Amino acid sequence: MVTAPLLGWVAVRPIPRLSKLNTCKYVSSSLQSYKRSVGSCLGKQQSRDFSYSATLTDAGINLEKTRNIGIIAHIDAGKTTTTERMLYYSGFTRRIGDVDDGSTVTDFLPAERARGITIQSAAITFHWPPLAADGTSSGPSLEELESQNLPRSRASHTVNLIDTPGHADFTFEVLRSLRILDGAVCILDGVAGVEAQTEKVWHQASVYQIPRVVYVNKLDRDGAAFGRTVREVGSRLQGWPAVCQIPWFEGGNGRFTGIADVISLQGLLWKEGGDGKSVKVFDLAGLENEDKRLAEELKHARVALVELLSEHDEDMVESFFEHEDHLKVPPMTILKSLRKCLLGPEAQKIIPVFAGSSFRNMGVQPLLDAVNNLLPGPSESVDPEISLGNSKGSLGNLLSGELTLQQEPKTANIAKPKQKKKTAVAPTSVDTKHLAANLESCALAFKVVSDAKRGVLVYVRVYSGTLNKGCQLYNTNLHVTERAPRLFKMYANDAVEVDSIPAGHIGVVSGLKYARTGDTLISCTGSKMTPPEPLNTLQLRPIDVPPPVFFASIEPHSLSEEKNMQEALALLLREDPSLHVTVDEDSGQTLLSGMGELHLEIARDRLVNDFKAKATMGRIEIGYRECVLGQSNPVTKIFDREVAGRKGKAGCTAVVEPYDPESGEPSSGGEDIIFAEIVEGNRIIISAPGINISTDKRGKEESSSLPSQFDVNSFRTSLYNGALSALARGPQFAFPMHNTKVTLTCNVVEHLFGSDSSASALSAAARLATQGALRDLATGQNSGTGIMEPVMNVIISIDEASLGAVVHDISSARGGHIISLDEEMPISTSIGGNDSPESEQVVIDVNKIYAPPDPFETPSVAGGLPIQASANQTRTITAKVPLKEMVGYLKHLRSLSAGRGTFVMHVDRFERMSAQRQKAVLAELHR
């Protein structure tokens, strides 16, 4: 046997003329000597559907050869370890980084290396298969590969990889990464199976319709069960597992030594203790001589894979009828069918599953080939959603001129109540064909990082056109124009300056002063600083920020340090929008809110160590909410004072009352309503009698009743901002208001005073009126306000022996409510109120899932084994528990489950406390 290490890896087929395969030895040699030796024995080299023999193609920009992928998983599943192997085999690094040693490329923050976890997502670009030594390639194009019936993995692809956190406290990091991905690799721990955070992130990825493959990792560990994990993929991830590889255990029950590839019907055997670059490859005949039991299982797996694909792809049915044998269906036909199912309408139903052990350097290169072969490029991914004016559509339709603006004559965001029938007014259609010619580039800022050397770095995904160095970028969210002085390609913590970032790629812009996470950045033709209407309203689908549930006070060491602390907080919030900063009006304390205890601890470390703020963080507290218990009297306030040296006068009337989000579609009042939306758990309604809104030819709202300094949008926004400001602090307990309905009435005749009325004065009047209505309610005899607490959706994973103790603890001592055992329902992961495409759930019969037998199980297979096959089977508890009772719960759970229990939680809703519980909480807060 001859093998030869390449930059990536080498898979060498055993030479048939040798009588004993086990006499093969690993020998280092050059690629040329490898070709000569194999060629002399075989006459013609047999091809393998992996990338070991790839001569690489042009390294230039090619969207078909670009992959924007993410690594998603539960904490400690092996995401960063797998990423480090990918970088090593691609030639990006010369050694393999280790999480325990703190030597990884993608975990570069001091806190990440100290804790051994990923805290912030890291972007890195590499090529697979690796480029030639001079950085160029000369391999075939995808068209040539197609004509030769060869896989895509024979041509070098540019892989933009994002390694995401696994800890639940850093969910926002995962969300903003998912927003810009075209595909993802979901890594599962072969011992733990499908864990709670994995399930949560999987369903979040489904919201964005991201094609995914599953990689079952850690199969070298004791207790690893690939077959059981495959069945859990079907039952918990709501899809049919397409088993593309099965593990190779020495002697059937021994150590993990390699994998058997179901697509190519080959066995891959790695050298024990090696770096994973040298692999022996056995065809089916050779595998029968080496491990007959594995060869038989491989045949079963191939039959199951072809049968599964035949149920979802007619081309596979035709291929099977043509060859009349599951084993004779060509590997390329299977690859094409898998890709078709993964990218087409069946994308949520078929889940390709691969196997390996990244720490032992086994299975990573075939996984990289699967990324090239199965996952989509930017041009094949879902057309991004956009809003333009008050209309919604897709960016592709806008660029092709097929998007037509439908401008309602009044407002587009209002849930209209049932009214008497009126004469219908047709919406105004605005042609957008001319807009595509004006749009040079469109990008989404998905992350902002403060770098000590380079300043503020804004990570962007370019969706159309090319973002060029020095171009003028218009921020459609903030309505400001900034120049992009420098562009970079990021390699974890290192950066390489580039002249442009093309469509479909991820890059970094430095020098932007205002851009935030979720902002849309566009550049247009011409010399004007502001794009023409309605192009200046173009916005890509934003990144939704989950609500914070913990907070802590931040105090500077001295008054002289307060300015530096505030500047550091501003940088921290620009980096991480899931953090919130508020100031308590009574005490003057600055409060920092976040997603969890660890989230706030990391924020404190960054504030003190990275931004050098001289400040101290107080005790971490729970973020409660305040709700109204009755309806207030109408309160009218007239704001009349100077603002910034100019006279300002405006008035407004406000009424507050309880709002029940579960009561169905709420009524929004009469026909004078110009705004009615749910914002941060509250409903804000704005009524403007006498405003008389009309729509011009461009679809813009206008009103002749408003003073000249107002347009309809600024009038509406001023009132909205005033109400929002008042709702940030309750009248009795100073918590933010929740489940509160505010109705603002601004009569343009009575409450506006010509040129004296300004936007700031109107906003102040709305704030004063809303605050007055809240105080009126708080001082009333039969009403007032109450406290609401966050209730968490908790998913607990424990073994069978600990089930009873944990259930009793949750339902009694912690006041929780058990929803289900063994997760009968998928985790709710609504993002921004959008329903997942998985609302039409795939019905999975676990008994029909093919799964290979695990070590020490009876060989079997197409019928599979029941999920409850083991006495030590992990059980899953789903419960609703008040957040207060979950603080510090992990330590208690581990004591109940002998250290084996884990849990993940996210905010389900806010619930009003009982009087007794509210009294206890207030007493604790006033200590």
UniProtKB/Swiss-Prot annotation:
GO terms for cellular component: mitochondrion. It comes from the Eukaryota. GO terms for biological process: mitochondrial translation; ribosome disassembly. One of its GO terms (molecular function) is GTPase activity. GTP binds at residues 73-80, 163-167, 217-220. NCBIfam families: small_GTP. This is Ribosome-releasing factor 2, mitochondrial. The gene is mef2.
